[in-house]
């Protein structure tokens, strides 16, 4: 039972970042990065933008069996980062609290969108009931604080063998 789910999680997360009023009022730029290593490339734009919501365009994946069918688990990661005045721990705490608030608003929007079927059944397999998040340590990036969160999406996949896909010896 493979789903014909054409839902684009990356575009969805970018839209959430671009339409959140708190993120807009604090000039967060929505963009993509390729894994944690890609963050440094985006950081080069800190001269133009002080705050970012970065959607990791790579996923961790796992295919597993759950009884009679198989599922593809995709793990999506989103970084919410804000710059602060270097060595100003009060400013750092304020910016970290801002990132926390944006994350909570995004989480509540995920729950709302899934429960209201706003996107049809596209969000059906998105696990909004358990989202892992981790805050950046104090000195992980000079002058930058924030957090990232990870969201699982488990979709059925059809792994039925099809002999027509194989050349016989």
Regions found by a protein language model. Give the residues of each.
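Small/polar-rich, solvent-exposed N-terminal microdomains that initiate assembly or binding
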Residues: 1-68, 164-169
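Extracellular/virion structural assembly segments
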Residues: 2-11, 69-73, 81-112
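Acidic-leaning, charged glycine-interspersed low-complexity segments
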Residues: 24-26, 96-154
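Short, cysteine-centered beta-strand-loop-beta hairpins and adjacent loop/turn segments enriched
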Residues: 62-65, 83-88, 156-162
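Catalytic micro-motifs at enzyme active sites that drive phosphoryl/nucleotidyl and oxygen chemistry
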Residues: 62-68, 131-141, 162
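Oligomerization/assembly interface segments of phage tail-like spikes and tubes
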Residues: 70-85, 142-157
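Intrinsically disordered, low-complexity regulatory tails
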Residues: 148, 158-168
């Amino acid at each position: 039972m493979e789903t014909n789910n054409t839902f684009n999680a990356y575009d969805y997360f970018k839209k959430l970042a671009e339409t959140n009023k708190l993120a807009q009022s604090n000039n967060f730029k929505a963009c993509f990065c390729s894994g944690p290593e890609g963050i440094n490339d985006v950081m080069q734009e800190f001269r133009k933008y002080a705050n970012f919501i970065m959607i990791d365009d790579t996923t961790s994946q796992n295919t597993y069996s759950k009884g009679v069918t198989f599922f593809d688990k995709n793990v999506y990661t989103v970084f919410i980062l804000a710059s602060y005045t270097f060595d100003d721990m009060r400013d750092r705490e304020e910016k970290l609290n801002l990132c926390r608030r944006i994350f909570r608003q995004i989480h509540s929007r995920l729950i709302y969108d899934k429960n209201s079927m706003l996107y049809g059944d596209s969000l059906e397999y998105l696990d909004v009931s358990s989202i892992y998040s981790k805050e950046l340590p104090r000195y992980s990036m000079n002058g930058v604080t924030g957090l990232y969160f990870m969201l699982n999406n488990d979709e059925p996949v059809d792994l039925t063998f099809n002999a027509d896909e194989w050349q016989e010896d």
